[in-house]
Protein backbone atom coordinates (compact mmCIF):
# COMPACT_ATOMS: atom_id res chain seq x y z
CA UNK A 1 0.00 0.00 0.00
CA UNK A 2 1.30 3.40 -0.89
CA UNK A 3 2.28 5.85 1.74
CA UNK A 4 -1.09 6.70 3.25
CA UNK A 5 0.05 9.84 4.96
CA UNK A 6 0.65 11.45 1.58
CA UNK A 7 -1.85 9.52 -0.55
CA UNK A 8 -4.91 9.03 1.67
CA UNK A 9 -7.38 6.34 0.68
CA UNK A 10 -11.15 6.75 0.83
CA UNK A 11 -11.11 5.25 4.30
CA UNK A 12 -8.52 7.72 5.53
CA UNK A 13 -10.61 10.57 4.16
CA UNK A 14 -13.56 9.15 6.04
CA UNK A 15 -11.50 9.33 9.20
CA UNK A 16 -11.26 13.04 8.91
CA UNK A 17 -10.84 14.94 12.08
CA UNK A 18 -11.04 13.61 15.63
CA UNK A 19 -13.45 14.81 18.23
CA UNK A 20 -10.96 16.93 20.13
CA UNK A 21 -12.35 17.51 16.26
CA UNK A 22 -12.77 19.51 18.29
CA UNK A 23 -9.62 20.80 18.16
CA UNK A 24 -7.14 19.78 15.53
CA UNK A 25 -7.61 20.15 11.79
CA UNK A 26 -5.51 19.11 8.84
CA UNK A 27 -5.59 22.74 7.87
CA UNK A 28 -6.13 24.46 4.60
CA UNK A 29 -5.69 21.95 1.80
CA UNK A 30 -3.74 23.15 -1.23
CA UNK A 31 -5.75 22.61 -4.39
CA UNK A 32 -2.90 22.29 -6.85
CA UNK A 33 -3.66 18.91 -8.36
CA UNK A 34 -5.76 18.32 -11.42
CA UNK A 35 -5.98 14.52 -11.50
CA UNK A 36 -6.27 12.58 -14.69
CA UNK A 37 -9.47 10.63 -14.42
CA UNK A 38 -11.83 8.62 -16.54
CA UNK A 39 -15.46 9.59 -16.82
CA UNK A 40 -16.23 6.91 -14.28
CA UNK A 41 -13.94 8.10 -11.53
CA UNK A 42 -15.66 9.09 -8.31
CA UNK A 43 -14.39 11.57 -5.83
CA UNK A 44 -15.66 11.55 -2.32
CA UNK A 45 -14.89 14.15 0.31
CA UNK A 46 -15.63 13.20 3.86
CA UNK A 47 -14.91 14.86 7.15
CA UNK A 48 -15.70 13.72 10.68
CA UNK A 49 -17.15 15.71 13.51
CA UNK A 50 -16.77 13.25 16.18
CA UNK A 51 -14.55 13.50 17.90
CA UNK A 52 -14.12 17.32 16.43
CA UNK A 53 -14.96 18.11 19.75
CA UNK A 54 -12.17 16.08 21.00
CA UNK A 55 -8.93 15.88 19.07
CA UNK A 56 -7.94 14.87 15.67
CA UNK A 57 -5.20 13.30 13.82
CA UNK A 58 -6.31 14.83 11.46
CA UNK A 59 -12.10 12.50 14.03
CA UNK A 60 -11.18 14.95 13.68
CA UNK A 61 -12.77 13.28 16.65
CA UNK A 62 -13.15 18.19 15.38
CA UNK A 63 -14.54 18.89 12.12
CA UNK A 64 -17.70 16.72 10.47
CA UNK A 65 -18.52 14.25 7.80
CA UNK A 66 -19.59 15.28 4.35
CA UNK A 67 -22.01 12.78 2.95
CA UNK A 68 -20.24 11.33 -0.11
CA UNK A 69 -20.77 13.31 -3.26
CA UNK A 70 -19.96 12.23 -6.81
CA UNK A 71 -18.72 15.09 -8.89
CA UNK A 72 -16.37 15.95 -11.70
CA UNK A 73 -12.92 16.87 -10.37
CA UNK A 74 -12.27 20.58 -10.42
CA UNK A 75 -8.83 21.88 -11.32
CA UNK A 76 -7.38 24.72 -9.30
CA UNK A 77 -3.94 26.23 -9.06
CA UNK A 78 -1.73 26.10 -6.02
CA UNK A 79 -2.05 28.97 -3.52
CA UNK A 80 1.23 30.47 -4.73
CA UNK A 81 -0.10 30.60 -8.29
CA UNK A 82 -3.57 31.73 -7.34
CA UNK A 83 -2.30 34.62 -5.30
CA UNK A 84 -3.20 35.78 -1.84
CA UNK A 85 -6.66 36.97 -2.86
CA UNK A 86 -8.00 33.58 -3.94
CA UNK A 87 -6.28 31.87 -1.03
CA UNK A 88 -8.08 34.20 1.36
CA UNK A 89 -11.38 33.44 -0.39
CA UNK A 90 -10.80 29.74 0.19
CA UNK A 91 -9.79 30.43 3.79
CA UNK A 92 -12.80 32.63 4.52
CA UNK A 93 -15.25 30.30 2.80
CA UNK A 94 -13.82 27.49 4.86
CA UNK A 95 -14.56 29.61 7.89
CA UNK A 96 -18.14 30.17 6.76
CA UNK A 97 -18.50 26.44 6.22
CA UNK A 98 -17.15 25.79 9.70
CA UNK A 99 -19.48 28.38 11.21
CA UNK A 100 -22.52 26.84 9.51
CA UNK A 101 -21.72 23.27 10.52
CA UNK A 102 -20.68 24.13 14.08
CA UNK A 103 -23.69 26.38 14.63
CA UNK A 104 -26.07 23.70 13.37
CA UNK A 105 -24.59 21.12 15.73
CA UNK A 106 -24.13 23.54 18.67
CA UNK A 107 -27.29 22.51 20.60
CA UNK A 108 -26.22 18.87 20.66
CA UNK A 109 -22.67 19.94 21.48
CA UNK A 110 -23.84 21.92 24.49
CA UNK A 111 -25.98 19.02 25.72
CA UNK A 112 -22.98 16.72 25.34
CA UNK A 113 -20.82 19.05 27.45
CA UNK A 114 -23.53 19.50 30.10
CA UNK A 115 -23.97 15.74 30.50
CA UNK A 116 -20.22 15.12 30.41
CA UNK A 117 -19.43 17.68 33.14
CA UNK A 118 -22.59 17.52 35.26
CA UNK A 119 -20.81 15.95 38.24
CA UNK A 120 -18.42 18.91 38.48
CA UNK A 121 -21.39 21.28 38.23
CA UNK A 122 -23.19 19.46 41.04
CA UNK A 123 -20.09 19.58 43.27
CA UNK A 124 -19.76 23.35 42.75
CA UNK A 125 -23.47 23.88 43.43
CA UNK A 126 -24.27 25.04 39.89
CA UNK A 127 -26.59 22.13 39.10
CA UNK A 128 -29.31 20.93 41.45
CA UNK A 129 -29.72 17.36 40.20
CA UNK A 130 -28.16 15.17 37.51
CA UNK A 131 -29.59 14.90 34.01
CA UNK A 132 -31.48 11.69 33.25
CA UNK A 133 -30.36 11.63 29.64
CA UNK A 134 -30.10 13.61 26.41
CA UNK A 135 -33.83 14.39 26.17
CA UNK A 136 -34.03 15.45 29.83
CA UNK A 137 -31.02 17.72 29.38
CA UNK A 138 -32.62 19.39 26.35
CA UNK A 139 -35.92 19.90 28.20
CA UNK A 140 -34.39 21.31 31.37
CA UNK A 141 -31.99 23.61 29.53
CA UNK A 142 -34.76 25.09 27.38
CA UNK A 143 -37.08 25.42 30.39
CA UNK A 144 -34.50 27.08 32.68
CA UNK A 145 -32.56 29.17 30.16
CA UNK A 146 -34.61 29.48 26.98
CA UNK A 147 -34.21 27.97 23.52
CA UNK A 148 -31.40 30.31 22.42
CA UNK A 149 -29.23 29.13 25.33
CA UNK A 150 -28.55 25.92 23.40
CA UNK A 151 -26.02 27.96 21.40
CA UNK A 152 -24.17 29.26 24.47
CA UNK A 153 -20.43 28.93 23.89
CA UNK A 154 -20.76 28.54 20.13
CA UNK A 155 -19.15 31.90 19.38
CA UNK A 156 -15.85 30.82 20.95
CA UNK A 157 -16.04 27.55 19.04
CA UNK A 158 -16.51 29.33 15.69
CA UNK A 159 -13.79 31.91 16.39
CA UNK A 160 -11.38 29.10 17.19
CA UNK A 161 -11.54 27.83 13.61
CA UNK A 162 -9.56 30.66 12.02
CA UNK A 163 -6.38 30.60 14.14
CA UNK A 164 -6.49 26.80 14.15
CA UNK A 165 -6.52 26.65 10.34
CA UNK A 166 -3.76 29.24 10.02
CA UNK A 167 -1.58 27.47 12.60
CA UNK A 168 -2.14 24.06 11.05
CA UNK A 169 -1.17 25.48 7.67
CA UNK A 170 2.07 26.73 9.26
CA UNK A 171 2.91 23.63 11.29
CA UNK A 172 1.75 20.67 9.22
CA UNK A 173 4.38 20.88 6.46
CA UNK A 174 7.21 21.47 8.94
CA UNK A 175 6.47 18.38 11.02
CA UNK A 176 5.67 16.35 7.93
CA UNK A 177 9.20 17.00 6.65
CA UNK A 178 10.70 16.41 10.08
CA UNK A 179 9.14 12.95 10.42
CA UNK A 180 9.32 11.97 6.77
CA UNK A 181 8.92 8.19 7.06
CA UNK A 182 7.29 6.20 4.27
CA UNK A 183 5.63 2.86 4.82
CA UNK A 184 7.06 1.18 1.72
CA UNK A 185 10.57 2.57 2.27
CA UNK A 186 11.04 2.54 6.05
CA UNK A 187 8.64 -0.16 7.13
CA UNK A 188 5.31 -0.07 8.92
CA UNK A 189 6.50 0.64 12.48
CA UNK A 190 8.74 3.59 11.57
CA UNK A 191 5.93 5.03 9.45
CA UNK A 192 3.46 4.46 12.28
CA UNK A 193 5.74 6.08 14.88
CA UNK A 194 6.45 8.99 12.56
CA UNK A 195 2.75 9.46 11.95
CA UNK A 196 2.06 9.63 15.69
CA UNK A 197 5.01 11.96 16.28
CA UNK A 198 4.22 14.39 13.46
CA UNK A 199 0.50 14.42 14.18
CA UNK A 200 1.03 14.83 17.90
CA UNK A 201 3.64 17.56 17.50
CA UNK A 202 1.63 19.55 14.95
CA UNK A 203 -1.55 19.09 16.94
CA UNK A 204 0.03 20.13 20.24
CA UNK A 205 1.69 23.16 18.62
CA UNK A 206 -1.59 24.42 17.20
CA UNK A 207 -3.49 23.51 20.34
CA UNK A 208 -1.16 25.57 22.50
CA UNK A 209 -2.31 28.78 20.80
CA UNK A 210 -6.05 28.05 20.70
CA UNK A 211 -6.53 26.01 23.88
CA UNK A 212 -7.82 28.95 25.88
CA UNK A 213 -10.69 29.36 23.41
CA UNK A 214 -11.65 25.72 23.87
CA UNK A 215 -11.46 26.28 27.62
CA UNK A 216 -13.71 29.34 27.35
CA UNK A 217 -16.18 27.46 25.15
CA UNK A 218 -16.33 24.63 27.71
CA UNK A 219 -16.92 26.97 30.64
CA UNK A 220 -19.62 28.95 28.83
CA UNK A 221 -21.44 25.81 27.66
CA UNK A 222 -21.44 24.44 31.21
CA UNK A 223 -22.53 27.71 32.80
CA UNK A 224 -26.07 26.54 33.50
CA UNK A 225 -28.70 28.98 34.72
CA UNK A 226 -30.75 26.69 36.92
CA UNK A 227 -34.12 28.07 37.97
CA UNK A 228 -33.66 26.72 41.52
CA UNK A 229 -30.38 28.59 41.87
CA UNK A 230 -31.96 31.98 41.24
CA UNK A 231 -31.01 32.13 37.57
CA UNK A 232 -27.53 33.58 38.10
CA UNK A 233 -24.74 32.72 35.70
CA UNK A 234 -21.07 32.46 36.60
CA UNK A 235 -19.87 34.18 33.41
CA UNK A 236 -21.36 37.03 31.37
CA UNK A 237 -19.61 36.16 28.13
CA UNK A 238 -16.36 35.16 26.46
CA UNK A 239 -14.30 38.11 27.73
CA UNK A 240 -15.67 37.60 31.24
CA UNK A 241 -14.40 33.99 31.23
CA UNK A 242 -10.88 35.21 30.51
CA UNK A 243 -11.08 38.04 33.04
CA UNK A 244 -12.34 35.92 35.94
CA UNK A 245 -10.08 32.95 35.19
CA UNK A 246 -6.96 35.13 34.97
CA UNK A 247 -7.92 36.85 38.22
CA UNK A 248 -8.47 33.61 40.16
CA UNK A 249 -5.96 31.19 38.60
CA UNK A 250 -3.68 33.16 36.33
CA UNK A 251 -2.54 31.87 32.92
CA UNK A 252 -2.42 28.31 34.29
CA UNK A 253 -6.19 28.39 34.70
CA UNK A 254 -6.67 28.81 30.96
CA UNK A 255 -4.46 25.78 30.25
CA UNK A 256 -5.76 23.33 32.82
CA UNK A 257 -6.00 19.93 31.10
CA UNK A 258 -3.63 20.87 28.28
CA UNK A 259 -1.14 18.02 28.87
CA UNK A 260 -3.77 15.28 28.80
CA UNK A 261 -5.23 16.90 25.68
CA UNK A 262 -1.91 16.40 23.88
CA UNK A 263 -1.86 12.78 25.03
CA UNK A 264 -5.36 12.41 23.63
CA UNK A 265 -4.18 13.44 20.17
CA UNK A 266 -1.55 10.70 20.10
CA UNK A 267 -3.87 8.07 21.61
CA UNK A 268 -6.55 8.75 19.02
CA UNK A 269 -4.12 8.64 16.11
CA UNK A 270 -2.65 5.40 17.40
CA UNK A 271 -6.07 3.82 17.74
CA UNK A 272 -7.28 5.10 14.39
CA UNK A 273 -4.32 4.05 12.27
CA UNK A 274 -3.80 0.85 14.25
CA UNK A 275 -7.41 -0.22 13.71
CA UNK A 276 -7.33 0.87 10.09
CA UNK A 277 -4.26 -1.13 9.15
CA UNK A 278 -5.39 -4.17 11.15
CA UNK A 279 -9.01 -4.39 10.05
CA UNK A 280 -8.98 -3.13 6.44
CA UNK A 281 -6.93 -6.03 4.94
CA UNK A 282 -9.18 -8.54 6.71
CA UNK A 283 -12.60 -7.02 5.99
CA UNK A 284 -12.25 -5.21 2.66
CA UNK A 285 -11.33 -8.15 0.45
CA UNK A 286 -12.66 -9.47 -2.84
CA UNK A 287 -15.69 -7.57 -4.11
CA UNK A 288 -15.65 -5.32 -1.04
CA UNK A 289 -12.15 -4.02 -1.71
CA UNK A 290 -13.30 -1.18 -4.00
CA UNK A 291 -16.85 -0.90 -2.66
CA UNK A 292 -17.45 2.65 -1.47
CA UNK A 293 -20.26 1.85 0.94
CA UNK A 294 -18.22 -0.92 2.57
CA UNK A 295 -15.32 1.53 2.96
CA UNK A 296 -17.70 4.17 4.30
CA UNK A 297 -19.16 1.79 6.89
CA UNK A 298 -15.73 0.60 8.00
CA UNK A 299 -14.40 4.15 8.17
CA UNK A 300 -17.37 5.27 10.25
CA UNK A 301 -16.93 2.35 12.65
CA UNK A 302 -13.20 2.93 13.01
CA UNK A 303 -13.42 6.68 13.62
CA UNK A 304 -16.25 6.27 16.12
CA UNK A 305 -14.53 3.28 17.72
CA UNK A 306 -11.30 5.22 18.17
CA UNK A 307 -13.30 8.21 19.39
CA UNK A 308 -15.19 6.22 21.99
CA UNK A 309 -12.06 4.43 23.18
CA UNK A 310 -10.29 7.76 23.75
CA UNK A 311 -13.40 9.57 25.02
CA UNK A 312 -12.40 9.16 28.71
CA UNK A 313 -9.38 11.37 28.01
CA UNK A 314 -11.68 14.10 26.74
CA UNK A 315 -13.81 13.73 29.86
CA UNK A 316 -10.78 14.06 32.15
CA UNK A 317 -9.47 17.16 30.37
CA UNK A 318 -12.83 18.90 30.41
CA UNK A 319 -13.44 17.99 34.05
CA UNK A 320 -10.07 19.58 34.82
CA UNK A 321 -11.11 22.72 32.93
CA UNK A 322 -14.18 22.96 35.13
CA UNK A 323 -12.08 23.29 38.31
CA UNK A 324 -10.44 26.58 37.31
CA UNK A 325 -11.72 29.22 39.71
CA UNK A 326 -12.99 26.59 42.15
CA UNK A 327 -11.62 25.99 45.66
CA UNK A 328 -10.90 22.29 45.11
CA UNK A 329 -8.86 21.23 42.09
CA UNK A 330 -7.43 17.98 40.81
CA UNK A 331 -3.69 17.64 41.42
CA UNK A 332 -3.11 16.23 37.95
CA UNK A 333 -4.87 14.44 35.11
CA UNK A 334 -3.99 11.11 36.76
CA UNK A 335 -5.51 12.32 40.03
CA UNK A 336 -8.65 13.40 38.16
CA UNK A 337 -8.91 10.01 36.47
CA UNK A 338 -8.49 8.15 39.77
CA UNK A 339 -11.00 10.31 41.65
CA UNK A 340 -13.64 10.00 38.93
CA UNK A 341 -13.25 6.21 38.87
CA UNK A 342 -13.31 5.92 42.66
CA UNK A 343 -16.23 8.26 43.39
CA UNK A 344 -18.38 7.96 40.25
CA UNK A 345 -17.40 4.73 38.54
CA UNK A 346 -16.11 4.06 34.99
CA UNK A 347 -19.49 4.90 33.46
CA UNK A 348 -18.95 8.56 34.32
CA UNK A 349 -15.98 8.72 31.94
CA UNK A 350 -18.34 8.09 29.01
CA UNK A 351 -21.12 10.53 29.92
CA UNK A 352 -22.15 12.51 26.85
CA UNK A 353 -20.69 10.04 24.35
CA UNK A 354 -24.12 9.31 22.88
CA UNK A 355 -24.78 13.00 22.27
CA UNK A 356 -21.35 13.25 20.67
CA UNK A 357 -22.28 10.65 18.06
CA UNK A 358 -25.59 12.43 17.37
CA UNK A 359 -23.69 15.66 16.85
CA UNK A 360 -21.57 13.96 14.19
CA UNK A 361 -24.68 12.95 12.26
CA UNK A 362 -26.29 16.40 12.54
CA UNK A 363 -23.17 18.25 11.45
CA UNK A 364 -22.62 15.84 8.56
CA UNK A 365 -25.98 16.53 6.96
CA UNK A 366 -25.73 20.30 7.25
CA UNK A 367 -22.16 20.46 5.96
CA UNK A 368 -23.02 18.22 3.02
CA UNK A 369 -25.92 20.46 2.04
CA UNK A 370 -23.79 23.57 2.41
CA UNK A 371 -21.08 22.11 0.17
CA UNK A 372 -23.66 21.42 -2.52
CA UNK A 373 -24.86 25.04 -2.33
CA UNK A 374 -21.28 26.20 -2.85
CA UNK A 375 -20.97 24.05 -5.97
CA UNK A 376 -24.33 25.34 -7.22
CA UNK A 377 -23.53 29.04 -6.74
CA UNK A 378 -19.73 29.18 -7.12
CA UNK A 379 -18.98 26.17 -9.31
CA UNK A 380 -16.63 24.64 -6.73
CA UNK A 381 -16.53 23.53 -3.12
CA UNK A 382 -14.36 25.66 -0.87
CA UNK A 383 -12.57 24.39 2.23
CA UNK A 384 -14.77 22.98 4.97
CA UNK A 385 -14.00 23.63 8.56
CA UNK A 386 -13.52 20.66 10.66
CA UNK A 387 -11.44 22.09 13.40
UniProtKB/Swiss-Prot annotation:
Extent of motif Nucleotide carrier signature motif: 317-322
Notes on how activity is controlled? The matrix-open state (m-state) is inhibited by the membrane-permeable bongkrekic acid (BKA). The cytoplasmic-open state (c-state) is inhibited by the membrane-impermeable toxic inhibitor carboxyatractyloside (CATR).
Q: Does the keyword Transport apply?
A: yes
Q: Which PROSITE patterns match?
A: SOLCAR
MF terms from GO for this chain are:
ATP:ADP antiporter activity
Using the UniProt record, give the first listed, main subcellular location. mitochondrion
Q: Which GO terms describe its cellular component?
A: mitochondrial inner membrane
Stretches the record annotates as Important for transport activity: 317-322
Where is the chain membrane-spanning? 87-114, 155-179, 188-208, 258-279, 293-313, 353-373
Q: Which Gene3D superfamilies match?
A: Mitochondrial carrier domain (1.50.40.10)
Q: Report how it sits in the membrane.
A: Multi-pass membrane protein
Which reaction is catalysed here?
Answer: ADP(in) + ATP(out) = ADP(out) + ATP(in)
One Pfam entry for this protein is Mito_carr
Q: Where does ADP bind?
A: 160, 172, 317
InterPro entries hit by this protein = ADT_euk_type, Mit_carrier, Mitochondrial_sb/sol_carrier, Mt_carrier_dom_sf
Taxonomically, the superkingdom here is Eukaryota
Location(s) in or outside the cell: Mitochondrion inner membrane
Transit peptide: which residues? 1-77
Q: Which PANTHER family match?
A: ADP,ATP CARRIER PROTEIN 1-RELATED-RELATED, ADP,ATP CARRIER PROTEIN, MITOCHONDRIAL
Subunit structure of this entry? Answer: Monomer.
Written domain comment of the UniProt record: The transmembrane helices are not perpendicular to the plane of the membrane, but cross the membrane at an angle. At least 2 of the odd-numbered transmembrane helices exhibit a sharp kink, due to the presence of a conserved proline residue.
Protein task: ADP:ATP antiporter that mediates import of ADP into the mitochondrial matrix for ATP synthesis, and export of ATP out to fuel the cell. Cycles between the cytoplasmic-open state (c-state) and the matrix-open state (m-state): operates by the alternating access mechanism with a single substrate-binding site intermittently exposed to either the cytosolic (c-state) or matrix (m-state) side of the inner mitochondrial membrane.
Give the protein family. Belongs to the mitochondrial carrier (TC 2.A.29) family.
For this entry, the protein name equals: ADP,ATP carrier protein 1, mitochondrial
Which species is the source of this protein? Zea mays
Taxonomy-wise, where does this protein's organism fall, top ranks first? Eukaryota, Viridiplantae, Streptophyta, Embryophyta, Tracheophyta
Amino acid sequence: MADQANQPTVLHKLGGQFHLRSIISEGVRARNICPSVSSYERRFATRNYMTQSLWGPSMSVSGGINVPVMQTPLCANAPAEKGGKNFMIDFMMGGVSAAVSKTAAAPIERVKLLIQNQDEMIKSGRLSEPYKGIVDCFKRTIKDEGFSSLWRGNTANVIRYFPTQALNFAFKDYFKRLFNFKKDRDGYWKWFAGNLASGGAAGASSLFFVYSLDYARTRLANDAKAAKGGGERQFNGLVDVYRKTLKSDGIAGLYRGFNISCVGIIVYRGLYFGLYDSIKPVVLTGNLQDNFFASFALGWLITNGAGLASYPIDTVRRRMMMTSGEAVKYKSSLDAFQQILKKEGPKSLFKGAGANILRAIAGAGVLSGYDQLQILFFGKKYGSGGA
